[in-house]
């Protein structure tokens, strides 16, 4: 599938490949396969079902980084993985310049503030559709979102308005119109 995706993208956009697996060894295999087909970056989440500590998450991600040596977007989604990529994790990962971004999907505004203030070297990416405006206000430069798959024009308009034009008054109006869709996307049971 990675090869097919790479052909379809044909260099028009960066290709980011997820490496999620229970075992670090399997994540490394996926990451190396991604590198071999020409992926531009990796998406690394916490291993599912394992409930790792911050140290264990960092060791997992650093092992993948050592083998693949590609830019990495971390994926923090404690609502699904039941653990947070905490400060211990982020501090340990700061040892490698490959950890360039984090898709933050905790839903916790305090965590957004902490990431923006304390980890400016890790680019913020919004992972919660209904919090895009807040993320953009705090400096996020990207948004990895489900809704863009079926409402791309509205998502592009919000990004253009907030990130490129810094017009948060207009951005609030766009986001307000999008909120009914966002509520559906962020509700439980998906």
Regions found by a protein language model. Give the residues of each.
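Catalytic alpha/beta core domains of metabolic enzymes, predominantly
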Residues: 66-67, 78-188
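Active-site beta->alpha loop and helix N-cap motifs at the rims of alpha/beta catalytic domains
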Residues: 1-82, 92
């Amino acid at each position: 599938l990675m090869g097919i995706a790479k052909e379809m993208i044909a260099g028009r956009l960066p290709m980011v490949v997820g490496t999620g697996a229970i075992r670090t060894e399997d994540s490394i295999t996926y990451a190396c396969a991604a590198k071999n087909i020409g992926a531009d970056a990796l998406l690394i989440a916490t291993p599912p079902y394992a409930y790792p500590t911050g140290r264990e998450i960092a060791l997992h991600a650093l092992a993948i980084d050592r083998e693949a040596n590609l830019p990495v977007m971390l994926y923090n989604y404690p609502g699904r993985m039941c653990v947070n990529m905490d400060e211990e994790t982020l501090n340990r990962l700061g040892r490698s310049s490959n950890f360039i971004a984090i898709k933050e999907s905790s839903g916790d505004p305090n965590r957004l503030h902490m990431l923006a203030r304390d980890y400016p070297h890790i680019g913020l990416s919004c992972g919660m559709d209904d919090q895009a405006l807040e993320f953009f206000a705090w400096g996020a430069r990207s948004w990895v979102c489900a809704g863009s798959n079926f409402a791309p024009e509205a998502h592009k308009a919000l990004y253009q308005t907030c990130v490129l034009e810094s017009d948060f008054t207009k951005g609030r109006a766009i986001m307000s119109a999008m909120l009914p869709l966002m509520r559906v996307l962020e509700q439980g049971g998906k």
